[in-house]
Amino acid sequence: CINAIEKIQNKRPKATPDFRNALEDKDVDVLIVTAPDHWHAPAAILACSAGKHVYLEKPCSHNPNEGELVVKAAAKYKRILQMGNQRRSWPNVAAAIAELHAGVIGKPYYAKTWYTNNRASIGVGKETAVPSWLNYDLWQGPAPRKAFKDNLIHYNWHWFWHWGTGEALNNGTHMVDLARWGLDVHYPTKVSSNGGRYRYQDDWETPDTQMINLEFENKSLITWEGRSCNGKSVESQSVGVI
């Protein structure tokens, strides 16, 4: 990673095994958080309290209460904090949303969103020694301690409630955010969901198949369909919002 960045900017960046060291560096203005989900809110709050602005990878937090704490921290320390739903920054998407808000198709009241994939089974992990390159104590951070298993790092932590938030907040958050933006809504008044782990019998805990319905005060509705292990497309696309 360091070598790749050096080639892009012709300057070798500093590296530290612990992000908290960067918070003490006066030359650092912004912390970009791309850690596992359970670290998102704590890292963002620490950064704000250290006087740093934050670009925070989705999801904002591991649970709703942490998200509220992040918002309060940004306000308290007067820091700029942006959550990484990057489509908000795409000019073509912003232009389309502006057209939608201007009434190009009338008043929209329903948005359908989805994400599909063909993820493989993660198997049943075995407790093993922590790899020499991994500071597992720091990786676990604020989470209660659990033994290291060989099917956890780098990506499969997404599917464990202890560290991750499942496909809904791994990918669903992108499409639902676009739908909220397009419908010009904020918090839902009613949420319902059903789903489960159906495709494989393994250590994966979060749903691999899920439906979420969100209703809003202005009589509008958003649905999200997630299928982590069945990549059959919807509307000829593996991911989308209409």
Task: Name these PLM-found stretches.
Residues 7-10, 34-38, 61-65, 84-87, ...:
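Alpha-helix capping and helix-loop boundary segments enriched in small/acidic/polar residues
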Residues 1-56, 65-80:
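N-terminal glycine-/serine-/threonine-rich beta1-alpha1-beta2 phosphate-ribose binding loop
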Residues 11, 27, 104-107, 187:
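Short loop/turn motifs at secondary-structure junctions
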Residues 41, 45, 68, 90-94, ...:
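A structural signal for well-ordered alpha-helical segments within the folded catalytic domains
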